A protein has these predicted regions:
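Active-site charged/polar residues at nucleotide-handling catalytic sites that mediate phosphoryl
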Residues: 74, 215
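A short, acidic, amphipathic alpha-helical segment used as a generic capping/interface helix at domain edges
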Residues: 182-185, 202-213
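Charged docking surfaces used in two-component/phosphorelay signaling
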Residues: 58-66, 199-206
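Glycine-rich, Arg-bearing micro-motifs that act as flexible, cationic patches
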Residues: 9, 81-102, 119-122, 221-242, ...
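A short acidic, glycine-rich active-site loop
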Residues: 170-178
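Small/aliphatic-rich secondary-structure junction motif
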Residues: 1-50, 54, 122-167, 188-190, ...
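Short beta-strand elements of ligand-binding domains
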Residues: 80-83, 107-114, 223, 247-252
Length: 257
C-alpha cells in the first residue's frame, strides 16, 4: 500500500506532506509524492519532499488528469491533497480538489490551509442514523491490528428524525443513544468502550464542522457517494469550506486496497 501525496509550491505544502506522513504511519504504509509541473514550478516542492524524505515524481500536463493517472499507475491506496488558501465562493476548495474528490474511487484526504502540525491522536467519524458506516468500517479495516487512536463516532440527528418520547423523555433519549452506540460498534466488531460516542441534534453541515473544533479532532472521516449536488454533498461542501481539520473522504464505491 502507498499513500500518494500531491506536493505543489504553495505555503500549504509542508502541512500536506506532514499529514500524509502521519496517516501513513497510522496505517503502516509508505508515502510517495507527485508534483505536476506548471511554468517551471517544482523547486519548492522538491525541497519539501527531500526534507521529508519522500520520493517525488514530476509530471506534466493537466493537474487533475496527471494526478488521476499517478494514482492508477502507482495503485495508491489513498491520495492526500491540499486546498487553496482562499476558500470562498461556489468552489470553496478549488476546482482541482473538487474534480478529484468527485471522480476518484479511492479515499482522498483534503488538507486545509494552516492545518495543525500535530500527531493523529483523535479521529472523528461521521456515521449514518442506523449506526452503519462505510467510513467507520474502512477505518478499522485499514488499521488492522495496529494501535488505534481515539475514535469519536458522531451522529447528527435532524429534529424530525427523533422518535417521539413519552412519559420519561430523558430516559428514552438515553436509551435511543445507547441503542445507536451498540449498532455502530457491532457494525465494525469493536468494543464499545474503546469508541467515544457523540450525538448532536440539528443541521448536519454546521454541527459536524462545530463538533470537529469542539472535540479537538485531528482528522475527520466521512463516507459519501462522490456527488456534491445531493445527499452527503451538502455536508462535504460545508466541511471543505468551514473546518481547519484535514478531511478523509471515503467513496462508498471505493476500490479495495
Amino acid at each position: 500500500m502507498t499513500i500518494l501525496v500531491a506536493i505543489d509550491d504553495s505555503a500549504n505544502a509542508h502541512s500536506v506532506v506532514g499529514v500524509a506522513r502521519r496517516i501513513a504511519t497510522l496505517f503502516g504504509t509508505s508515502v510517495e509524492g507527485v508534483h505536476v509541473q506548471e511554468d517551471g514550478s517544482g523547486q519548492r516542492a522538491a525541497a519539501i519532499a527531500d526534507a521529508a524524505n519522500v520520493p517525488l515524481r514530476v509530471r506534466h500536463g493537466d493537474v487533475v488528469s496527471a494526478l488521476r493517472s499517478e494514482v492508477k499507475e502507482r495503485d495508491a491506496t489513498a491520495l492526500v491533497i491540499g486546498t487553496r488558501v482562499q476558500r470562498e465562493g461556489p468552489l470553496p476548495a478549488g476546482h482541482v480538489t473538487l474534480d478529484l474528490v468527485s471522480s476518484l474511487n479511492r479515499p482522498i484526504v483534503v488538507v486545509p490551509p494552516h492545518a495543525a502540525d500535530r500527531p493523529l491522536r483523535s479521529v472523528l467519524v461521521a456515521v449514518e442514523g442506523d449506526g452503519e458506516s462505510h467510513a467507520l468500517s474502512a477505518l478499522y479495516e485499514r488499521l488492522g491490528n495496529r494501535p488505534v487512536p481515539e475514535v469519536i463516532v458522531l451522529h447528527i440527528v435532524e429534529p424530525s428524525e427523533l422518535p417521539p418520547f413519552s412519559d420519561s423523555p430523558v430516559l428514552e433519549a438515553e436509551a435511543f443513544e445507547r441503542e445507536f452506540m451498540i449498532r455502530a460498534s457491532h457494525s465494525v466488531s469493536a468494543d464499545p468502550s474503546l469508541i467515544r460516542f457523540e450525538m448532536r441534534v440539528g443541521d448536519a453541515p454546521s454541527l459536524v464542522c462545530k463538533a470537529a473544533h469542539e472535540l479537538d479532532a485531528d482528522l475527520v472521516v466521512m463516507a459519501w457517494h462522490r456527488s456534491l449536488s445531493a445527499g452527503h454533498g451538502r455536508l462535504v461542501r460545508a466541511m471543505l469550506s468551514g473546518t481547519p481539520v484535514p478531511i478523509a473522504l471515503v467513496p462508498i464505491d471505493a476500490d479495495a486496497h
